[in-house]
């Protein structure tokens, strides 16, 4: 039996999703910072993957899972890691079919979920083949290294992408807790993994944006839609039974301060953030302040700073999605994804507040960002020119964002051929 991994607060990435009616251009936009883990830095490059370069049999470098792939992949462009020791790690990409993905946003699920559905981790071989007690290697599931390679070149819409990813998760499992973004010119879907084999997905409403800062963030889920028309929700086939069988729906989450929060389940709706997610001191230092700052910028007329503010940097109930006050521009995205609490007492580069407050919370723009990729899928231009990848390589506060067409046969050599040196 694969033992549950300990719940940890993710140490990388910030995601901002913009529905087509919420964006200034009328396009869907998915943006994510890919941040290296503490103590390392992962440089990136930009490459076009031809169908002939796509493997037909895939083996993960990290988990050693092996998967046969379809024989009809399409061309796609990705911004993967340069260092080869951790596999492809495509991170963000768009296909010639105008489907885009960003993977992954590290999230955390609670111990109750992991006990009920443990992560599927690689178990190395033990002993010597042919001798007593030998136990062969057991591969792990799929993870950030694999997801875009296994999904993006085989789907024609965001919905198809969710379905394919869900099938892979249910069959092979996963060894880590992740959020995955899949979009097309009309829709944005956000998938969160629940334990080793379960998952939920929610569509971002067209007139809304969504903020995800390394937490399991979806705060409403409608089972009647997920098992009906699937207009806004999808999930693994046995999710409802899984929740009931392991009493997860009875979960009460510690409220901020003292006492307990409200019950998680109400008829056909659950709050996944309560049922599956975490609420810890680490979340309030590392995660919730980033959601607070993004929404503070996009809904500025609300009270965010007074003692009576509805949401504070440590609020657990900051909405997963909401309508912005004004249409969101690429400039807004660039600012937010490189931001460091400008205009607040929490800016580490600022002069407001105190030395303590300026280092209290984890900002979005940090020095271990490998790149920010915002993929804009436009509906008012020819399909061949619809996908634009806005990319900033390196630490956001000190770099500039530049646009690149994604539907290409090749990429500039100075971005394609980046070496570890």
Name these PLM-found stretches.
Residues 341-421:
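Substrate-recognition/cap regions that form aromatic- and gly/pro-loop-enriched pockets
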